UniProtKB/Swiss-Prot annotation:
The keyword Cell division does not apply. This is Potassium/proton antiporter CemA. The keyword Acetylation does not apply. Pfam families: CemA (PF03040). The chain crosses the membrane at residues 9-29, 116-136, 191-211. It is found in: Plastid, Chloroplast inner membrane. The gene is cemA. Contributes to K(+)/H(+) antiport activity by supporting proton efflux to control proton extrusion and homeostasis in chloroplasts in a light-dependent manner to modulate photosynthesis. Prevents excessive induction of non-photochemical quenching (NPQ) under continuous-light conditions. Indirectly promotes efficient inorganic carbon uptake into chloroplasts. It comes from Manihot esculenta. It comes from the Eukaryota. One of its GO terms (biological process) is potassium ion transport. Belongs to the CemA family. It catalyses: K(+)(in) + H(+)(out) = K(+)(out) + H(+)(in).
Amino acid sequence: MKKWKKKTFIPLLYLTSIVFLPWWVSFLFNKSLESWIINCCNTSKSETFLNDIQEKSILEKFMELEDLVRLNEIIKEYPETHLQKFRIGIHKETIQLIKMHNEDRIHTILHFSTNIICFIILSGYSILSNEELIILNSWVQEFLYNLSDTIKAFSILLLTDLCIGFHSPHGWELMIGSVYKDFGFAHNDQIISGLVSTFPVILDTIFKYWIFRYLNRVSPSLVVIYHSMND
């Protein structure tokens, strides 16, 4: 009995850790790496890195400041005290703009580093926990085996419609855009459109191949029900 409880508890603990481990790792590394990255960015003498979004935003801000400077030259009849305050305001705005750029740069480096570290840790954790994965796989297979063919076909149809259906490109666009943003990459409409138009097609081809090679051999009745629902 104790052995059975242990075999049940360990895979559940492993599953819980897989779900929450990325959050814990991300939080810990964000806190530990933030000060180090800030120091590196402040002391680094390398060239300033700007992605397309940051460059566009900063150029727009500087154009606004340039317009203000031109306005300053036009209104020469203003008292000297007013012009001095005007110059001080432009100087403060420029400093604030540089600070915003530095914060964006730190945020980009921090998130990219954290994501890479999380991926490495999760990969190593999954490789080392081979026994727990085998137990979880047996649970999933037993659960699927106990389902009726109708429920299986309905679940497959629902999943495929969500992932590769005619309305799925909007979801893929949001997901790919969020990944780009999370890794600090510039938003590129051409790359995102290319991925959205090709990735679901690749998934659809893989899924049809899986039905042809695996489901036709394991459960022909499930394939018949699936095609009936799909039609």
